[in-house]
Amino acid sequence: MNFLKFKSKITNKEKIYINKNIKKIEFSLCSFLSKEFNIDITNDIDIVSGFERDWSNIPGDAEYLTRPINDIQCALVLYICNQLKIPVTISAGKTNLTGSATPMGGLILSVINMRSPNTLVNKKNKTVQVAVGTTLEDMRTEILNISNQSLCYPVDPTSRKDALIGGTVSCNASGFIPGEKGATRYWVNKIKIILPNGYNKKITRGEFISKNTQFNLQCGDEKILIEVPDYHRPKIKNASGPFTADDNEIDFIDLIIGSEGIFALITEVEFNLSNTADKYLDLFITLRSEQEAIKLRGFLEKKNIIYDLTALEYFGYNCQNYMLHKKQLFKDEMSVGIYLQYPVIDELIDNSIEKWIKLLDQSNCNIKDDDIILLNSPENWRMFFEARHSMPAKALEKTKELDAISIITDTIVPYENFNEFINFSHSILQHNKIEYLLFGHLGDCHLHFHVIYTKEEALIINDIYQQIIRKSAKLGGVYSAEHGTGKRKTIDFLECYGQEAANQVQQCKLAFDPNNILNKGNIINIKGS
């Protein structure tokens, strides 16, 4: 079914009262929302400024900050701002790296106080209902506690201690697990959304499917036709813009997930859960070269085991120079490393270790027994954990030392083109003598080039970055596998998909949001608004 009927919790009497008051010359948004509806809102610049930047550090600007506590308050804020055409930027944990929570004027709607209802785990159905203002790590911990360690939510992005649930769904956050199970989308079963006009609806996966790439929405007497974008979107780990109907059909829930808040505000979420493993086998493997690491990844895919892993992380070019404990982990300065995590289910850990040693020997990647470090002891795990997490800190130190700037690519290409893409990127950076390191999610062929450059190198870096983006698109990949588009990568979206795709996203957005108030500047820039 492609027909969705939305409801409004704002009564007609309230709408008449609101519309009468907002036309008054002396109308004050802060005063009206706080006095009439007891909504937390402020225009205190010292408070508002604390929400004007996310982790992208892109400068933002806003006049108001509101922190509603429930969806009725959210609906009232959106309805009034829509009537007044005040831009609304949705803010969650502000952990995004591309500026999707950076405001461009108007009002910031923070979901930080949307903490009701309490986390509810259904052990029989293996689901969890959770408030959008809950931090991801708090939810993950609560699920384990409530289920007596029998169920888990597997998505584990690095920012999980700070990221809020609403933001992870809006941006389709992903973690370390290779394949589709590593991204939020796979686990979302239900959401509740509020449109800019204040109307809301609960959406269940599989309930609403597009017909001829269209959805029909009804909000009271208003009928809205949604034309879903249908440009081709590579079916790999992909956070580059909203989901599309390039196969003619799309689940409505997938159109909202990962759309970075440009269509609607998410106020409730239900996730499916996974059974927990009995134990995990954690290995650090030293290899002689990057080519051997890529070869190992291909071998594991041929053995149909790569998507059973819960991590396949790569530490390559120049990483050793930014890591603690490198002598304990690597054989020599030219070595690269792989961290592998395998869930052990209905098997003794010793048997699993023996099986993996044999498997790695069969890979013909020149892996010897002393190239494998078992991380399951507390001492070894602590050593690896400190080494892994020292990289960004040391990279930041280097950046400050050089009075430099850093940029991290988020590109991804299919495995068959992976070698060509990696070699191209290495070549162009090394030819220009640019400092960088390479690490990331080898299971998805999604590695990050962390580039550190001086202000004098800014022009050449911009050119190099665009060449890397163009190369990824040419090889069937995309510019963003996990970080999204936000405001920082709108040019990359055009480079990857073209103007026609941007036009399709614009048409879809303006059907949901005719006044273009929600998350202006995310994914695309709409001229004249």
Put a short name on every predicted segment:
Residues 117-120, 132-296, 518:
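FAD-binding subdomain of flavoenzyme oxidoreductases
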Residues 40-45, 66-68, 88-92, 99, ...:
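General beta-strand structural signal in soluble alpha/beta enzymes
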Residues 199, 489-529:
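Activity-critical C-terminal alpha-helical subdomain
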Residues 3-6, 42-51, 256-463, 471, ...:
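C-terminal substrate-recognition/cap domain of FAD-linked oxidoreductases
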Residues 1-79, 95-128, 158, 268-273, ...:
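N-terminal flexible segment immediately upstream of the FAD-binding catalytic core
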Residues 473-485, 514-517:
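Alpha-helix capping/hinge segments and adjacent helical runs
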Residues 55-56, 450-457, 488, 495-496:
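Conserved PLP-binding active-site segment of the aspartate aminotransferase-like
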